[in-house]
Curated annotation (Swiss-Prot):
A GO cellular-component term linked to this record: cytosolic large ribosomal subunit
Record bears the keyword Lipoprotein: no
Family the UniProt entry places it in: Belongs to the universal ribosomal protein uL13 family.
Keyword Transferase: no
Domain of life: Bacteria
A GO BP entry: translation
Cystine pairs: none
Species name: Cereibacter sphaeroides (strain ATCC 17023 / DSM 158 / JCM 6121 / CCUG 31486 / LMG 2827 / NBRC 12203 / NCIMB 8253 / ATH 2.4.1.)
The protein's role, per its UniProt record: This protein is one of the early assembly proteins of the 50S ribosomal subunit, although it is not seen to bind rRNA by itself. It is important during the early stages of 50S assembly.
Protein name: Large ribosomal subunit protein uL13
Keywords noted in UniProt: Ribonucleoprotein, Ribosomal protein
């Protein structure tokens, strides 16, 4: 029997809504990355964008285990000598764009090539509970009920 390989006509993209409130960051990012890649589908083909569109709301209320909220650092370089800078996860979550913590966690779980960049365009992350994608009628995925370890009280 020949191995099934999907064609562009076989790809069917759905919209999935995930509420990140009280969910552990790494576990959320793993679930989202697998959905974006399409690994949850029986027709998964590694070299094609098979994944669904994912909407993550309440990204500012995501949880971290241990001391990661205070100790985890996000580094960047200004391009000047001695220009390495960083912010802690706590500073990012309390700043102007707290959704970037979830974006960066998922981005680092997706392959770093043109296919990965294409898959990341199917992810929308919002800090609050509101999102402008009601017209797409997203199906709700309750990450908290999948595994008791997925959630953590503040």
């Amino acid at each position: 029997m020949k191995t099934f390989t999907a064609t562009p006509a076989d790809i069917e993209k759905k919209w999935i809504l995930i509420d990140a409130e009280g969910v552990v960051l790494g576990r959320l990012a793993t679930i989202v990355a697998n959905i974006l890649r399409g690994k949850n589908k029986p027709t998964f083909t590694p070299h094609m964008d098979m994944g669904d569109n994912v909407i993550v709301i309440n990204a500012d209320k995501v949880q971290m285990t241990g001391n990661k909220r205070a100790d985890k650092r996000y580094y960047w370089h200004t391009g000047h000598p001695g220009g390495v800078k960083f912010r802690t996860a706590e500073q990012v979550l309390e700043g102007a764009h707290p959704e970037r913590v979830v974006l960066k966690a998922v981005e680092r779980m997706i392959s770093r090539n043109s296919l990965g960049r294409q898959q990341m365009t199917n992810l929308r992350v919002y800090a609050g509970a509101e999102h402008p994608h009601e017209a797409q009628q997203p199906t709700v995925l309750d990450v908290k009920s999948l595994n008791p370890k997925n959630t953590r009280s503040a």
